[in-house]
């Protein structure tokens, strides 16, 4: 990730009649970041996304995309933005290629460049074999890929994805997540969801909304942990020396290892070290209790009342 800020939203406020739905929401996103926007149903996630995309007016605050103010330079700002709503905007009676060409033209891609733009988006989204098929004849997973393709056909710098894996089977979820990771290497992406595993699998940072307020905003790295247990105690120093481990904490059930990358890679490194040292591995398990506990603490009970 570099430090190029691609999306900056400050002080977003929104009312529905007399009810205030958003309270001074700030979001700043740099190239290479994937932000997981978490919240219960009705927390304000979709309202926030619609404001960021210019589909809904805010009653306060400002949004800049690639340095262009959405309020005063909407055309330039939206040219840098791709949006996948929770229900993809698909024309089911169109063929995939025809639909993507239409989307490219709507996004301002020149007529003589549309075919190349569609071919590029189709390739990235794994749609090369279905370009001539009707959208209605595709599986749910492929329709979701078409939805993502329409969001990237004009080469945006910022992607906003609302519940991108909703309704997919496990294999489709895996494929869509891998696609989002790949797209996130050169873009800034917001993934809105109420599904905690989505954040664990994708996000480099996560934000929790509750009743229209940001109640938490932090890197996801602190939540990537392994719980390990061995027959012979290795000691904290030996565990800290394992590649990818940034922090070691003792727990009643063994050790908690905070890692700076994918937990699977750290688990493999731990297993190799444990076998070499003869520690006797009893358990290697991703430990995500912290994220779930934090989410529940901030969105229910006394903590939620205090935050509101």
Predicted features by range, described:
Residues 31, 129, 230-232, 261-262, ...:
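Non-catalytic surface loops within mature trypsin-like serine protease
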Residues 102, 120, 237, 272, ...:
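Surface-exposed charge patches
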Residues 4-9, 14-210, 214:
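ABC transporter nucleotide-binding domains
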Residues 126, 244-249, 280-285:
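A short linear hydrophobic-aromatic micro-motif
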Residues 175-260:
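ABC transporter nucleotide-binding domain
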Residues 72, 91, 197, 233-234, ...:
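Short alpha-helical
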Residues 1-13, 301-308:
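ABC-family P-loop ATPase nucleotide-binding domain
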Residues 262-308:
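C-terminal coupling/interaction segments
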């Amino acid at each position: 990730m570099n430090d190029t800020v691609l999306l900056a939203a400050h002080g977003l406020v929104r009312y529905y009649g007399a009810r205030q739905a958003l309270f001074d929401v700030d979001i700043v996103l740099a190239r290479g970041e994937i932000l997981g926007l978490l919240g219960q149903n009705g927390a304000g996630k979709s309202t926030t996304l619609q404001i960021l995309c210019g589909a809904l007016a805010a009653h306060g605050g400002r949004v800049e995309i690639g340095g262009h103010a959405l309020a005063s330079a909407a055309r330039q700002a939206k040219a840098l933005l791709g949006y996948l709503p929770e229900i993809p905007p698909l024309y089911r009676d169109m063929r995939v290629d025809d639909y993507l060409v239409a989307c490219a033209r709507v996004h301002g891609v020149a007529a003589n460049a549309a075919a190349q733009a569609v071919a590029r988006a189709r390739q990235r989204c794994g749609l090369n074999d279905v370009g001539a098929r009707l959208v209605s004849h595709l599986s749910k997973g492929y329709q979701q890929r078409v939805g993502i393709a329409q969001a990237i056909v004009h080469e945006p710098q910022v992607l906003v994805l609302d519940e991108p894996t909703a309704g997919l089977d496990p294999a489709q979820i895996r494929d869509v997540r891998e696609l989002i990771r790949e797209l996130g290497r050169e873009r800034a992406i917001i993934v809105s969801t109420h599904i905690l595993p989505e954040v664990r699998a994708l996000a480099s940072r996560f934000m929790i909304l509750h009743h229209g307020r940001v109640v938490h905003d932090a890197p996801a790295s602190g939540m990537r942990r392994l719980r390990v247990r061995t027959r012979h105690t290795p000691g904290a120093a030996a565990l800290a020396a394992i590649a990818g481990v940034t922090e070691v904490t003792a727990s009643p059930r063994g050790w908690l290892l905070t890692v700076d990358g994918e937990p699977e890679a750290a688990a493999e490194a731990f297993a190799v070290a444990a076998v070499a040292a003869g520690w006797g591995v009893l358990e290697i398990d991703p430990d995500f209790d912290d994220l779930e506990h934090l989410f529940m603490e901030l969105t229910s009970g006394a903590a939620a009342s205090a935050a509101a």
